[in-house]
Amino acid sequence: MFSSVFKAIFGTKNDREVKKYLKRVAQINALESKYQNLSDDELKQKFIDFKTQIQKEEKTLDQILNDVFAIVREVGKRTLNMRHFDVQLIGGMVLHEGKIAEMKTGEGKTLVATLPVVLNAMSGKGVHVVTVNDYLAKRDAEQMSAIYNFLGFSVGVILSEQNSDEAHKKAYECDITYGTNNEFGFDYLRDNMKFSKLEKVQREHHFVIVDEVDSILIDEARTPLIISGPTNRTLDGYIKANEVAKQMQKGQAATTPQELPSGDFVVDEKNRTIMITEAGISKAEKLFGVENLYSLDNAILAHQLDQALKAHNLFEKDVHYVLRDKEVVIVDEFTGRLSEGRRFSDGLHQALEAKENVKIQEESQTLADITFQNYFRMYKKLAGMTGTAQTEATEFSQIYNLDVVSIPTNIPVARIDKDDLIYKTQEEKFKAVIEEIKKANAKGQPVLVGTASIERSEVFHNMLVKERIPHHVLNAKNHEQEALIIQDAGKKGAVTIATNMAGRGVDIKIDDEVKALGGLYIIGTERHESRRIDNQLRGRAGRQGDPGVSRFYLSLEDNLLRIFGGDRIKNIMERLGIEEGEHIESRIVTRAVENAQKKVESLHFESRKHLLEYDDVANEQRKTIYNYRNELLDEEFDLQDKILKNIAEYSNHLVSQIYLNAELEDDVKHFESLKQKVSYECNLELNEVDFKDLGVIEVENKLSEILEKVYKDKMSIIEDKEARRIERILYLQILDNLWREHLYQMDILKTGIGLRSYNQKDPLVEYKKESYNLFMELVERIKFDSLKLLFNVAFTQQQAQNFEEKSHEQNEQFLSNTTESGVNENGEAQITKVPRNSPCPCGSGKKYKECHGKSGPKKGILA
């Protein structure tokens, strides 16, 4: 009550924010005539003067914002014949401040972005503009380049079809770079697999504007970007698990604590999980021919069965995936587009391939990964635009520290949003939708029908064909024509069926004749789990004050109502005595549906938050490794000093491990053990004479001294610059291989950590502890394994000169095979044994045992 009184007197927080921006808009408007009277050259010079002040740090961006926005507005008029409205200036200020600007469809977000882009590009550090697909990235860059070019800025576009690093690097070197979220993220991961700073394509993460920010930072937050390579694991288990899954009976969950679940397994649609019952475990063990399905030996088999049951019971063909050219291709649940090149992780994709009886592709191992959440949080300043953000304002604030500001429309929205119509069955609902389409089509009013899946869009397509109503279908199966189909959706008599938010980012324009007919009619055929997606569908009509209508048709058989809210609504319908074919239209019911959506949104938010808590652990490790890797790539980094410190640390580790071992009773056994270890790990022969009568600390110092001398002697045959390069590349190879291995260990840890809760332990706390231990092991192995490799590799000067070039070639080949796949092969060891009493091969004239047969190199492995 008090909050509503407060709002009535003082306005909402958003109203107060907008009022603050309006004061500055008046100041920008006051400058319009000043810049209007300048010639093109004078306007350009004025801009250069401001740019110089920024680069010399004489002024801040905030101090020149009014002038720069006024200049950009003037340039927009001259180059594009487009003038930024006052509300667009507000949007520009919101973006510059690192916030999210919520702007309705048709309010010109593409033009708004030019204001903060130009302002922030003046620092010379680069600005990135992120869109959801290649089409929009290319379109926006081309449309707005006239403004940027006038002001002396270069514009680059990153497209998925560009295969060369050179093209990407050129785009990133531009002042302003447009591209998709996937390409930006993958370029970052690929950069951190390169062997030279010069090969990297990205520069620093300075300022980014994410278009359709809710789609990228919310909808796709649970989908990490992964670069992977193949594993050597067998695929037979998936075929067997699929056969077993087909023989298991679906049951019902227990309704009371005393009751047991029925059947072999229970499906939890709400949380999208499968629980195998005791009866199901016994049946599976019998079918697999194993004694204990959940023993350590059968852990992979149990996991494959779990994925097979998910594939059969939670994933529908033409809803979650399609079959194209005998391959399982994912359908993006938020856009309805095919996710070409993407695969479900954790063996789920293999389970779907087994289910559909197509070729099962190799399981992949993660080589590098990052979530969008953590990628975009790397930018010094992050901003976003969308038509729908307020419903997720809490998540944006808590996870990204982003405030949402709703920008007023330039012209009030004239669209009529009608209450939902709810039917008992889907069949009744389908018939009602077709009747409504026929009515609207008869008078020429264009209709856009939104469906939640490809399967549903095909149902409506077939029904419209029977009714002989001409129409277009836009779904993942024909997304190539997306923009063209959506552009025509506002024409008189047009009927368009679109999966979910397909065609987002493309405006639907209507002419005066259509306006007179009531504008575009949006029909939603079921509510999405998120209110935001429904609002996006409604928002396709009523752009820039155009008339329009929207209405959702629902049934009690729709997934949302069936899983999350059907009983209450069903009871209302039964009390009202609703007959077959009849519907109810009531604000109470609409509110009940919205409450069901809030439940789901809350579940998804917790899921994303939970994912981030786990990924934050891995992210800190990733940042540490990538920062260290970048240090190694820096030619100024003193790697030799690092190696010498590693030698001292390795000597301490080895001597402590052996000489403080209570099982080894005397110094002779201690030395023999040390000798074997050093011989095996470092390819060196230790001489007992060098270690006779030495205490533990003296042994450690002596070992360190010998290793240091051998290392320096080995590298002295090569020019200093070449030696440092070889050390750097060998170190990087070890780091990369161990990091990949570590990611695999982390995946295994994450998969099983949830079971700790049965032991009254917090899985997240346990994950943090264990991942920390794994990481400390990784750091130690990087230091010690790189040393071992250095001691095991022998070079001639000629080999050293060719080494770097070959290593770069191998790494490029490796990166090009990842999915990107490929694993480097180790060269064969060439071992040369010299008898101890023979002349030493070094040419000193001494016997081998008195020269290099003393404590020193034992054998050489040619790189």
UniProtKB/Swiss-Prot annotation:
Function according to Swiss-Prot or TrEMBL: Part of the Sec protein translocase complex. Interacts with the SecYEG preprotein conducting channel. Has a central role in coupling the hydrolysis of ATP to the transfer of proteins into and across the cell membrane, serving as an ATP-driven molecular motor driving the stepwise translocation of polypeptide chains across the membrane.
Subcellular locations according to the entry: Cell inner membrane; Cytoplasm
Keyword set, alphabetical order: ATP-binding, Cell inner membrane, Cell membrane, Cytoplasm, Membrane, Metal-binding, Nucleotide-binding, Protein transport, Translocase, Translocation, Transport, Zinc
Membrane association type: Peripheral membrane protein
EC number: 7.4.2.8
Disordered: region residues: 806-863
Biased composition (Polar residues): 812-829
Swiss-Prot/TrEMBL GO biological process terms: intracellular protein transmembrane transport; protein import; protein targeting; protein transport by the Sec complex
Protein name listed in UniProt: Protein translocase subunit SecA
The reaction(s) this protein catalyses: ATP + H2O + cellular proteinSide 1 = ADP + phosphate + cellular proteinSide 2
UniProt binding sites for Zn(2+): 840, 842, 851-852
Coiled coil: none
Cofactor note: May bind 1 zinc ion per subunit.
Example of a GO MF term: metal ion binding
Organism: Campylobacter lari (strain RM2100 / D67 / ATCC BAA-1060)
Subunit structure: Monomer and homodimer. Part of the essential Sec protein translocation apparatus which comprises SecA, SecYEG and auxiliary proteins SecDF-YajC and YidC.
Keyword Ion transport belongs to the record: no
Annotated positions binding ATP: 88, 106-110, 507
A GO cellular-component term linked to this record: cytosol
